[in-house]
Amino acid sequence: MKSAIPSLMVQGTTSDAGKSVLVAGLCRVLARKGINVAPFKPQNMALNSAVTKDGGEIGRAQAVQAQACNIEPTVHMNPVLIKPNSDTGAQIILQGKALSNMDAASFHDYKKVAMNTVLDSFSKLTKEFDSIMIEGAGSPAEINLREGDIANMGFAEAADVPVIIVADIDRGGVFAHLYGTLALLSESEQTRVKGFVINRFRGDIRLLQSGLDWLEEKTGKPVLGVLPYLHGLNLEAEDAITAQQELNSEVKLNVVVPVLTRISNHTDFDVLRLNPDINLSYVGKGEKIDKADLIILPGTKSVRDDLAYLKSQGWDKDILRHIRLGGKVMGICGGYQMLGKTIDDPDGVEGEPGSSEGLGLLNVHTVLTGSKQLTKTEAVLNLNNQKAKVKGYEIHVGRSQVLDEQPLELDNGECDGAISECGQIMGTYLHGFFDEAEALNLITEWVNGTQVKQQDFEVLKEQGINRIADAIEQHMNLDFLFK
């Protein structure tokens, strides 16, 4: 079935206005109608990424949006991915592959070249799909970023696509955000805007009506919908760590994750956060690691810098105390590398060349290399004389020499990870390690001999996507939008 509107771009008044969620919902709405739809985001900045079936790397939001379309994600759905590795620099991923590290000024100069890549990927998608739902980045009204823009109106003008603008009413100032954003656009860009969407509304819509009437009168643009605040969508966050859950004293397992400065793929912990038998706590700057059954060191975009940060917080001492008291420790990806004896970066892959002494809890030596491992993987976890299937993915630079026992047998015949001789410390390169209920229960048995409630995380995500689509169908003027 063909869509009446081949492409539509969702831009926002701010970051976290609801662009990713709205695009996911629109994708599911169109997919329900039998339309061959795909998501697209020209430029994304995120440390939470996903691996595509063709061995590339894209923003996680586009992987979720592809799921909403009932299709597999590809690198062309997010042709430019920026992964910050310092306050002023980032690794640039182009069509799924690492290009180089750039500072902000260098990337600004490179954007003219990047636009060609963006338009190439968009062209490929338009030939394969009937409808493309496009997500902008941040706000189109950032004056200092408008020159050479490839993320918002610069792309919309180049690709000649219509735009809707979404704002989050929950943070306040929604009318100023929408009116001001439109006012800061050029005349041709304003003409491109079909209307507004207000997101995360709570209360009586009748009390909002006078404001909606004012906005439409002042701008000449319709408000296409007011979407309710949807709690507990259970979709993977792209940037911000999900707010701390309320802790329950009667749970079976307490898990603590130290928040590193460049923490990446913290979506690994969503399945733990959503399990009613698990308390998941994030420990931040200046806080102690305490009252844990399991400490997990997460992935990071800057392993050596974050290892130094971990030590500066005294978390290395907290971890040693935890082990002396019989607790368990895991490391995922960069966190796994930290648990080893040494991390060498002779070529300056992550910054200045050099070596760092790890925590020394696993007999593992890592050398960071320029080539990045990007694979989807299935494996068998062998732990405490039991086995469980694991599905995950690898996103890392570096190769590790492992002298400890390796608990994971990969589907390609290789082994992954390490477990200490004492049996209390384990590491793996696999993200998504806990998503399989069988593997999660094997881990919880290893930690403290308990089993937790089995939940299918994919089912929870599907429920969240469908709730968004239901709200869009109920509260948005889709006839006007897609006429």
Swiss-Prot record:
<dbReference type="InterPro" id="IPR027417">
    <property type="entry name" value="P-loop_NTPase"/>
</dbReference>
<dbReference type="Pfam" id="PF07685">
    <property type="entry name" value="GATase_3"/>
</dbReference>
<comment type="pathway">
    <text>Cofactor biosynthesis; adenosylcobalamin biosynthesis.</text>
</comment>
<comment type="function">
    <text>Catalyzes amidations at positions B, D, E, and G on adenosylcobyrinic A,C-diamide. NH(2) groups are provided by glutamine, and one molecule of ATP is hydrogenolyzed for each amidation.</text>
</comment>
<dbReference type="InterPro" id="IPR002586">
    <property type="entry name" value="CobQ/CobB/MinD/ParA_Nub-bd_dom"/>
</dbReference>
<keyword id="KW-0169">Cobalamin biosynthesis</keyword>
<comment type="similarity">
    <text>Belongs to the CobB/CobQ family. CobQ subfamily.</text>
</comment>
<dbReference type="GO" id="GO:0003824">
    <property type="term" value="F:catalytic activity"/>
</dbReference>
<dbReference type="InterPro" id="IPR033949">
    <property type="entry name" value="CobQ_GATase1"/>
</dbReference>
<dbReference type="Pfam" id="PF01656">
    <property type="entry name" value="CbiA"/>
</dbReference>
<protein>
    <recommendedName>
        <fullName>Cobyric acid synthase</fullName>
    </recommendedName>
</protein>
<dbReference type="InterPro" id="IPR004459">
    <property type="entry name" value="CobQ_synth"/>
</dbReference>
<feature type="domain" description="GATase cobBQ-type">
    <location>
        <begin position="252"/>
        <end position="439"/>
    </location>
</feature>
<dbReference type="InterPro" id="IPR047045">
    <property type="entry name" value="CobQ_N"/>
</dbReference>
<dbReference type="GO" id="GO:0009236">
    <property type="term" value="P:cobalamin biosynthetic process"/>
</dbReference>
<keyword id="KW-0315">Glutamine amidotransferase</keyword>
<dbReference type="GO" id="GO:0015420">
    <property type="term" value="F:ABC-type vitamin B12 transporter activity"/>
</dbReference>
<dbReference type="InterPro" id="IPR011698">
    <property type="entry name" value="GATase_3"/>
</dbReference>
<dbReference type="InterPro" id="IPR029062">
    <property type="entry name" value="Class_I_gatase-like"/>
</dbReference>
<feature type="active site" description="Nucleophile">
    <location>
        <position position="333"/>
    </location>
</feature>
<feature type="active site">
    <location>
        <position position="431"/>
    </location>
</feature>
